[in-house]
């Protein structure tokens, strides 16, 4: 009797880290929504072509959630990301910083191979 062993090679891929929406960013968005006086507003983060590195980030308020949007909620604040933008933002951190240079939303994106000096555009 002979035994035949079958060896199968499996490749496992790690699930990408979801997008991190920091407490600081959620708190600032909550403040901005309160100023607008419209509790139905959500922060939409998107990626579009442009900037000196090829892609740039955008932020806007939106009342409508589209079918292809990914929705994240933090401390009662909703963040919307469309499907095309999501693929560029997987693993990113969306934060809000205040320092001597001013106050701004900041995206730390591990998918960006290069960024411009101002940090608002990137390439992959």
UniProtKB/Swiss-Prot annotation:
GO terms for molecular function: 2 iron, 2 sulfur cluster binding; 4 iron, 4 sulfur cluster binding; iron ion binding. InterPro entries: FeS_biogenesis, FeS_cluster_insertion, FeS_cluster_insertion_CS, FeS_cluster_insertion_RrpA, HesB-like_dom_sf. PROSITE patterns: HESB. SUPFAM superfamilies: HesB-like domain (SSF89360). Its cofactor is iron-sulfur cluster. Keywords: Iron, Iron-sulfur, Metal-binding. Iron-sulfur cluster binds at residues 52, 116, 118. It comes from the Bacteria. Binds 1 iron-sulfur cluster per subunit. GO terms for biological process: iron-sulfur cluster assembly. Belongs to the HesB/IscA family. Required for insertion of 4Fe-4S clusters. Homodimer. HAMAP family: Fe_S_insert_ErpA. PANTHER family: IRON-SULFUR CLUSTER ASSEMBLY 2 HOMOLOG, MITOCHONDRIAL. This is Putative iron-sulfur cluster insertion protein ErpA.
